[in-house]
Amino acid sequence: MIYLDNAATTLQKPQAVYDAVYDAMKTLGNSGRGFSGAALGASRMIYEARQTLCDFFGGSDPSRLVFTSNATEALNMAIQGMFLPGDHVITTQLEHNSVLRPLYAMQKKGVELTIAASGQNGTADFDAIEAAIRANTKAIVCTHASNLTGNLTDMPRMGELARRHGLFLIVDASQTAGVIPDRKSVV
């Protein structure tokens, strides 16, 4: 079988993934539910995973890492939990529905939204994004790799833009985290 939509659902997984899931289902308990060997094993595994991911993404504090069931839930949590009526958010034309739908929902609740045009080559237009910044702008929300064009956003540049203006940066790295070898291009 030739499966061409791997980035969306990752149909074929390495055997080690199946083995780890089977082992977890067979031997682990619920983290934080007591001091049994199974519960402590689950807590230890979560701690180690949190530390590994923090190191991978260059974080400084693994306790600040939050696990969700998937990227869509994480994006919804960040977008719906961060903005209040009157806040302004900038996103791009390149975004996936997992970013756009919660932003539209927040817009109905009084959050101001600007969707910046993309450049001619289907990448983020940094000039358009910077021109959209206002006094009440709180964040830029953008994808690292567009599922529309396949192009990458220059995240170090986007991060510098956000820092320069004191903005939060929410990155949808669903298509690239763990795939792009240079994590510094993601964060």
Region spans (language model):
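Pyridoxal 5′-phosphate
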Residues: M1-S185
